[in-house]
Amino acid sequence: MTQGAVKTLGKRSQAVSAKKQAILSAALETFSQFGIHGTRLEQVAEQAGVSKTNLLYYYPSKEALYIAVMQQILDIWLAPLKAFREELAPLVAIEEYIRLKLEVSRDYPQASRLFCLEMLQGAPLLQAELTGDLKQLVDDKSAIIAGWVASGKLAPVDPHHLIFMIWASTQHYADFAAQVEAVTGKTLQDEAFFQSTLENVQRMIIEGIRVR
């Protein structure tokens, strides 16, 4: 293959990747507003700036597109937990996990709300991912927390409930952003409010698991 052909192939691959990402971004916006049942592929195609035929070339059905969006969300959602490291001091590791989770709520609110909506519906299209990659990762990190508890580095706490508490307290600011803004007049986009939220959530959780 000539150098020119390689460059052409590379540009074509980049164009395809950009088009697929545009479709996924449009689908996220539409699904988060209307849900899978209220969304039409024509809406997504128009939002992405492609034809419906072109959309179906990459994602052959609405369900396939929805699953692709949810898998991308799950990758974003799991990234902070993957960064949870045993070699850090326990309280430092947990503080950092809280920070990363709150940043996800700030930076990807639509993704968080769509994920929440899927959970409320029983996650019919996401069971394989939840019982596979998600469960394995949570089990692995729970074992780290259990080890810290056993060695006296953390107060006695059930690892699963600690993780659930962190999820609940950080994702609330994305999933219930309208309520948070109605009560406080602020969102996580306000840097001072983000910092105050982070410090308060960290303090409430850390003080509950600190060894005394």
Ranges and model annotations:
Residues 19-28, 44, 69-73, 77, ...:
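Generic hydrophobic, amphipathic alpha-helix propensity
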Residues 106-128, 176-184:
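Amphipathic alpha-helical segments used for helix-helix packing
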Residues 92, 128-133, 149-165:
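All-alpha amphipathic helical-bundle segments outside canonical DNA-binding/catalytic cores
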Residues 69-96, 144-147:
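Amphipathic alpha-helical linker/stalk segments
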Residues 82-111, 159-166:
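Hydrophobic alpha-helical connector segments
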Residues 22, 30-64, 68:
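Helix-turn-helix
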Residues 98-101, 115-118, 166, 170, ...:
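Short alpha-helical scaffolding segments that buttress acidic/His motifs in well-ordered protein cores
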